[in-house]
């Protein structure tokens, strides 16, 4: 057999041209220990803080501790079958969750996966859970209200769009009830709502979802559930996931409201993770960065200006501002607001609504303590008519509390003091409100007008509730057009004052209660 050198060279060239090798560079590591949802990994030299690490079985862990010779990561989900020696690898991505209008009306877990049995979610994309908050230049001052429908809140501690208003109190004082009613009151306001349940019983979350559905508010709400049975990692990340879903609406020139229920349990979950990662404990065994845990979350709630929205949407949305309003909830122990986490969150937020167990147990619900409840920026966002008429309420209550304490020791009181005590009792009675009965701006205005201009003076204390019910019924039935107009504008002038006066005069002359 004779070999032709030309044929051989052609054959070699052909084979070289056809040769195709696929090389893949992967940053891999090996699990060296697994305990309590924390894995230690040898290798992964290029891993980033907060990066997702791919585990066997289509699961992920988040890198939190970057040490000299190992990486500490927290597993997102079940970890019982993970074992020493298993191979893991970097993904080059941080945690992202689905965002978009398709999530409205759905119940999802921390990772944005549906858990309500209603099928897949059509999302508009993904967003990182950790995002830097808008800068000072991108923000706009708070000057539009978020109506909660509660007389005590909207009159004394008003909330504005883009504000962070803390709801704080002991367990069983009506914190969740207040937040849920605020969500229900937004069903026709155009404000999208996100409810983040952290560390609660699954039955409690199911009850909240049912109540939202019954009152027609679920279609406008995303529920993010990280129940007590979920891992500490998912409870720690749930607020950030919910915030990313809310930012989708804010950045497109819309308004959103997010409730974190509650951040005390998130701090406990983060403390658990930090201690398992062997980070040094500080006050109350919390890690040193627990303040940053909440500040970086709550700073993302803001009102952004038109330029920010236009730049974000690449010119698709013009002339619109967006907002994300946050209602974080903190549970105190025996009314101690000077504990570590409560003081942190009070210092971060723009005000707090303090709910007191003594008031709650004495039948004053919502149990708002007007003495230490405050809204630092909401006053500029308050509806004109409510702002004008609510001025005397806080003063009346403050004077009443002071006199009531003094009256316990005094045997006989002069007429002026007795009159002031009677007025304070009636105002306190009038501010009581049942759950799931939010009031419109016009309804609140009529009630506040009655307080401000002495229409309650001749009404017995025991008849205040029936007086209020009859007054609202009379106003809505006989002056529906005026009430609708007042709800729309929220203005207050001499003409509106005269109309309100004629409504009250007509009611007292012709109605029985």
Swiss-Prot record:
InterPro entries (alphabetical): ATP_synth_asu-like_sf (IPR023366), ATP_synth_asu_C (IPR000793), ATP_synth_asu_C_sf (IPR038376), ATP_synth_F1_a_nt-bd_dom (IPR033732), ATP_synth_F1_asu (IPR005294), ATPase_a/bsu_AS (IPR020003), ATPase_F1/V1/A1_a/bsu_N (IPR004100), ATPase_F1/V1/A1_a/bsu_N_sf (IPR036121)
Site (Required for activity): 373
Chemical reaction(s) catalysed: ATP + H2O + 4 H(+)(in) = ADP + phosphate + 5 H(+)(out)
Name of the top EC class for this enzyme: translocase
Gene Ontology MF: a single term: ATP binding
Listed SUPFAM superfamilies: C-terminal domain of alpha and beta subunits of F1 ATP synthase, N-terminal domain of alpha and beta subunits of F1 ATP synthase, P-loop containing nucleoside triphosphate hydrolases
Keywords from the named record: ATP synthesis, ATP-binding, Cell inner membrane, Cell membrane, CF(1), Hydrogen ion transport, Ion transport, Membrane, Nucleotide-binding, Translocase, Transport
NCBIfam families in alphabetical order: atpA, PRK13343.1
Family note: Belongs to the ATPase alpha/beta chains family.
Function: Produces ATP from ADP in the presence of a proton gradient across the membrane. The alpha chain is a regulatory subunit.
UniProt name for this protein: ATP synthase subunit alpha
Organism from which the protein derives: Haemophilus influenzae (strain ATCC 51907 / DSM 11121 / KW20 / Rd)
UniProt lineage: Bacteria, Pseudomonadati, Pseudomonadota, Gammaproteobacteria, Pasteurellales
